[in-house]
Amino acid sequence: MIVIFLGPPGAGKGTQGKKIAKKIDLPHIAIGDIFRTIIKTSTSEAELINNYVKQGELIPNEIVNQVIKNFLLSSEYKNGYILDGYPRNLEQAKFFESFIKEKIKIIYFDVSDELLIKRVLGRYSCKNCGKIYNSYFLQPKTDNVCDVCGSSTFDYRKDDNEEVIKKRIEVYKTETYPLIDYYKNSGNFYIVDGSKNEQEIEIDIQKILKIN
């Protein structure tokens, strides 16, 4: 099974990707995480990618496509995966279809701009276990103590400020809305209400994928 999660930054793709991947025992491939890992390396490619991220610009298709292809053609992904954040436009979708022949399901997370901004601005995670929190909606039960592992060290994403987030949303709309129209005609396109809580969204996705 190959499942693509589409939606703007802050839509909840990463949270649901991890949940559903664990439930159906498939890898969750988060494109943002892949590129954040690359940025931490001391390479010219990392510097180039980091410049795009800082400015709120999308990374060029040729860079994204090659990185993703290298990942997806690995043997560990031969049985399927949940793909979070790719493709983001028609060019990427057609490149993806050129080397992936399996049937896919596309799930789009529909969320208002106002809610997206709060979700992204408030987002942080436990540095030890990766548990995601939000200063607006989901704080640890005990201040500065992770609910899962008890760590008191948290990671706040440096590229998350309101101006950059708004720009990322607008760039996303320009790039991705034509892709959504393209996938709507595929017969395997589904929309979930991303403003619901985590449990409700998870249930909606399980129904789409026909899993318990």
From Swiss-Prot:
Record-listed ATP binding positions: 10-15, 123, 132-133, 196
Family to which the UniProt record says this protein belongs: Belongs to the adenylate kinase family.
NCBIfam families for the chain: adk, PRK00279.2-1
Protein residues bound to Zn(2+): 126, 129, 146, 149
Descriptive protein name: Adenylate kinase
Gene: adk
Catalytic activity, as annotated: AMP + ATP = 2 ADP
Domain notes: Consists of three domains, a large central CORE domain and two small peripheral domains, NMPbind and LID, which undergo movements during catalysis. The LID domain closes over the site of phosphoryl transfer upon ATP binding. Assembling and dissambling the active center during each catalytic cycle provides an effective means to prevent ATP hydrolysis. Some bacteria have evolved a zinc-coordinating structure that stabilizes the LID domain.
